[in-house]
């Protein structure tokens, strides 16, 4: 029996304080904290119609983007007739089944820790008359955490317009299960609020970890047992009586400590090679450099996704070799796991490559354009495709700074 405390990749070692959503990466980029070029990339009109319909801020008309419709919808009223709940455990099972019916691929439930509720909104939304910077009050008891998995093959075509379109489609589709589940619970007579892409009052990642959806990887993302790192996270907070789940142990601590494949493939050196974790806002974890990560996205004009596609946990769901590897990892005692991890990483490099990539053509898009082709508007420089460049080695990491999101803020 493995008696180590979980979650071991997200160890709470001190006091956590709430964070202002305005001091998280996307709002910071939008207001120019990452520089004028990044701000233009965030708001500039794209020449690609897929980019425009998935990003209201870059569209000819924001109402052409479905996500804009969702975020402008007001929160529905709670049915005054309450459906009694006799068994919270049974209700939890029913809610999970309903969430999957609405489109979620993974569901878990945890208590809503106020440390993961943002202090202020970055953007006005929900059509409820709120303004940018309004304080957030969210006193619900539970958080229903859901994940929507991306298609493995199209993710493997990154960085490309093909992978970008699929990634953005996942962001948009993730709103549907959250929106519908919150409405379903309100019709049962209980308050509920949905939180999904571009519409978050909570930080979904730590909640998903506590709800047992997966563990935190070296690359700073959730690793799910079946879907790896390609999960779009959404949350519904509510007072509906529910039974909560426990965090899981997927051997991510041992695997990430040795593997470092995401660090080797990261073109901007934004993922640390260090075996020593850092403590930020009371949590011990591996830290990524958000500045260099975002600026690389601007430089290549794509969502990079190498940290997602290179993750050894990222395989097609249900394949026998992944099921076998996961079973072996989970059943191996903690002290012996490094002996299992090393050959698994070696086999992953052998069969899927040290920098996994799938060539793909779709519509007029090609994930493997000829050398010298650049997607950045106006660029005429000769380039090698990202997946053909040299892998990173341990060495000096990209310059970093203390991001405002890592500095606790006082809650008045």
Where are these regions (language model features)?
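Flanking helices and flexible, charged tails adjoining ferredoxin-like Fe-S electron-transfer domains
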Residues: 1-12, 277-412
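A composition-driven signal for long, intrinsically disordered, charge-rich low-complexity tracts
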Residues: 51-55, 85-87, 106, 175, ...
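Catalytic cores of enzyme domains
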Residues: 105-331
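Non-catalytic, usually N-terminal nucleic-acid engagement modules in DNA/RNA processing proteins
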Residues: 1-154, 160-161
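Flavin (FAD/FMN)-binding glycine-rich loop and adjacent Rossmann-like elements that form
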Residues: 82-85, 134, 226, 352-361
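Proline-rich intrinsically disordered, low-complexity coils
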Residues: 74, 80, 84, 88, ...
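Glutamate identity and glutamate-enriched acidic tracts
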Residues: 15, 21-23, 36, 97, ...
């Amino acid at each position: 029996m493995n008696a180590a405390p979980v979650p071991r990749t997200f160890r709470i070692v001190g006091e956590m304080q709430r964070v202002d959503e305005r001091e998280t990466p996307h709002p910071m980029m939008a207001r120019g904290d990452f520089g004028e070029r990044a701000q233009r990339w965030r708001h500039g009109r794209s020449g690609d119609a897929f980019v425009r319909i998935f990003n209201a801020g870059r569209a000819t008309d924001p109402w052409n983007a479905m996500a804009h419709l969702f975020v402008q919808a007001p929160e529905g009223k709670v049915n005054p007739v309450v459906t009694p709940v006799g068994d919270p455990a049974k209700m939890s099972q029913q809610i999970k089944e309903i969430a999957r019916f609405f489109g979620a691929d993974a569901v878990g439930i945890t208590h809503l820790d106020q440390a993961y509720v943002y202090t202020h909104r970055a953007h006005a939304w929900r059509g409820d008359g709120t303004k940018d910077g309004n304080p957030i009050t969210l006193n619900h008891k539970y958080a229903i955490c859901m994940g929507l998995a991306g298609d493995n093959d199209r993710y493997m075509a990154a960085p490309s317009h093909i992978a970008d379109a699929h990634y953005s489609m996942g962001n948009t589709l993730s709103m549907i299960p959250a929106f519908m589940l919150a409405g379903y619970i309100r019709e049962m007579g209980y308050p509920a609020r949905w939180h999904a892409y571009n519409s978050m009052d909570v930080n979904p990642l730590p909640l998903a970890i506590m709800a047992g959806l997966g563990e935190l990887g070296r690359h700073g993302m959730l690793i799910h047992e079946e879907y790896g790192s390609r999960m779009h996270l959404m949350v519904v907070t509510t007072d509906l009586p529910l039974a909560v789940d426990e965090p899981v142990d997927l051997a991510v601590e041992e695997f990430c400590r040795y593997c470092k494949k995401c660090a080797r493939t990261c073109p901007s050196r934004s993922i640390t090679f260090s075996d020593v974790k850092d403590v930020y806002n009371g949590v011990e974890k591996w830290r990524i450099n958000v500045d260099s990560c975002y600026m690389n996205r601007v430089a290549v004009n794509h969502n990079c996704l190498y940290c997602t596609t290179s993750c050894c946990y990222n395989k097609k769901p249900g394949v026998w070799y992944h099921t076998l590897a996961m079973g072996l990892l989970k059943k191996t005692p903690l002290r012996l796991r490094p002996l299992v991890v090393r050959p698994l990483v070696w086999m992953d490099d052998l069969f899927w490559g040290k920098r996994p990539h799938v060539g793909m053509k779709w519509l007029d898009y090609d994930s493997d354009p000829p050398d010298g082709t650049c997607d950045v508007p106006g660029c005429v420089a000769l380039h090698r495709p990202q997946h053909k460049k040299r892998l990173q080695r341990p060495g000096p990491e990209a310059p970093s700074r203390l991001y405002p999101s890592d500095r606790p803020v006082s809650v008045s």
